A protein has these predicted regions:
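Extended hydrophobic blocks
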Residues: 1-123, 222-285
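A structural signal for short, hydrophobic/glycine-enriched beta-strand patches
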Residues: 112, 118-268
Length: 285
């Protein structure tokens, strides 16, 4: 309705250029949405080729197919409109359109706020820097993705104005891993950086992002009263992580490290889906 109201407002003006601009926008928006669907499918195949098959890596092509199916549905619906057209068919169609619009606008808002959050200024004084774990290479070594997180955390460690700051390596041991993710992070720090061993704490119980934060918070509170945290993860993951941090009353900020460009679309979709599941009551309401 907002979209139609804006269109009506523009066409109420007597300026021909404004009319032409609105026509261009009306045509451009569906074209861009259609192209985004094609892009996500292509990106999905690139991701599957580089990262291998997994349920998470299927999100990008699935989202692309869903977008294209919307246009197919609208085309089929247009073909059914005749003189004896049953208008009750509009009810499920309008429901589907409404669902697409709600989730579409929410996804755009999610992405915009995620990027804004990354650019927000960070305070320099923290008591702990949390390195969020990730899957391990051959079950015992850090992956390039996890290495970028660690390097970003080390950079923040040396830039900190707190002489007593500590790193928390956070991550439990998966069923296919030989050691915990926290231990792998610790090994990398000891072997490849100058961070003192006594400045590294291990949190080896967590299996999810939420637990990473919760258990790290509990660990930090054993050493400092009302500690401030800087949690380091990938840029696409910062917004959801900061949402969980607020839920558990953690004081601190998120810091994102770079991500391979081909991985970003699928990663943001995955983060969005995870956030929707966590906040499903908001969408249902």
């Amino acid at each position: 309705f907002l979209y139609l109201s804006i269109v009506n407002l523009v066409f109420s003006f007597e300026y021909e250029n404004a009319h032409l601009l609105m026509v261009a926008v009306i045509l451009l928006i569906p074209i861009l949405i259609l192209l985004s669907g094609v892009f996500l499918i292509i990106n999905g195949f690139i991701l599957l080729k580089k990262e291998g098959f997994s349920k998470a890596n299927l999100l990008s092509p699935i989202m692309g197919i869903v977008i294209l199916l919307f246009f197919v549905m609208m085309w089929i619906r247009a073909g059914f409109i005749t003189t004896d057209y049953n208008h009750w068919i509009n009810i499920p169609v309008l429901f589907i359109i409404y669902t697409y619009i709600i989730f579409g606008f929410a996804f755009v808002g999610f992405m915009m706020y995620s990027f804004v959050y990354l650019w927000l200024p960070k305070k320099q004084h923290y008591d702990f820097i949390i390195v969020h774990g990730a899957g391990l290479l051959n079950g015992e070594r850090v992956t390039p993705l996890l290495k970028r997180r660690i390097d970003k955390a080390v950079q923040a460690f040396y830039q900190s104005k707190n002489p007593h700051i500590r790193l928390i390596a956070s991550g439990g041991q998966g069923s296919d891993e030989k050691i915990s993710e926290a231990q792998a992070i610790y090994n990398y720090l000891v072997e490849n950086t100058d961070v003192p061993k006594e400045a590294i704490l291990l949190e080896e119980k967590s299996t999810t992002t939420y637990e990473n934060l919760l258990f790290s918070k509990e660990l930090g509170e054993q050493f400092v009263e009302n500690p401030r945290f800087l949690f380091v993860t990938n840029d696409y993951h910062v917004f959801r992580t900061s949402t969980y941090a607020r839920q558990i009353g953690m004081q601190g900020d998120g810091l994102g490290c770079s991500t391979a460009s081909y991985y970003i679309p699928s990663a943001f979709i995955r983060e969005y889906v995870a956030l929707c599941v966590k906040m499903k009551k908001l969408f249902i309401g």
